[in-house]
């Protein structure tokens, strides 16, 4: 009897988890790749995990904050661009290290200069644009 209850508990948990996980659209997936594979993002994340753990943190991540499709992407709001942040993860906070913007109309990746309130065009793998522009 205990095994049956345990089985249904595990089954129920896995069903709940699969419904709770939202998969972003194809375009958002490629926008993530554009950011994560950019030389600037790689520069910022080199050795970052070790430094975070040394300071009591758990990890870092890139998060989609807003997108042109907030209903299909796990983003917090609508924007004409794909807006990301690179953040550190601690038990009590998530400090943001950098913000990135991918503009699908201009086909350009930017790093946001928060102090001067401007976007700075940065290098990225242009081959990913072909995949981004592919209709699915």
Residue ranges, per PLM feature:
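Short, non-transmembrane alpha-helical segments in secretory-pathway proteins
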Residues: 21-68
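C-terminal partner/receptor-binding element of secreted or periplasmic proteins
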Residues: 111-136
């Amino acid at each position: 009897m205990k095994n049956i209850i345990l089985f249904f508990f595990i089954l129920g948990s896995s069903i709940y988890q699969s419904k709770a996980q939202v998969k972003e659209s194809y375009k958002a997936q490629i926008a993530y790749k554009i950011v994560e594979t950019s030389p600037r993002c790689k520069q910022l994340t080199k050795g970052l995990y070790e430094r975070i753990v040394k300071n009591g943190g758990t990890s870092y991540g890139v998060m989609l904050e807003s997108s042109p499709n907030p209903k299909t992407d796990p983003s917090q709001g609508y924007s004409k661009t794909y807006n990301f942040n690179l953040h550190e993860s601690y038990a009590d906070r998530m400090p943001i290290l950098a913000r990135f913007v991918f503009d699908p109309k201009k086909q350009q990746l930017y790093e946001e200069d928060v102090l001067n309130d401007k976007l700075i065009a940065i290098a990225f793998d242009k081959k990913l644009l072909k995949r981004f522009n592919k209709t699915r």
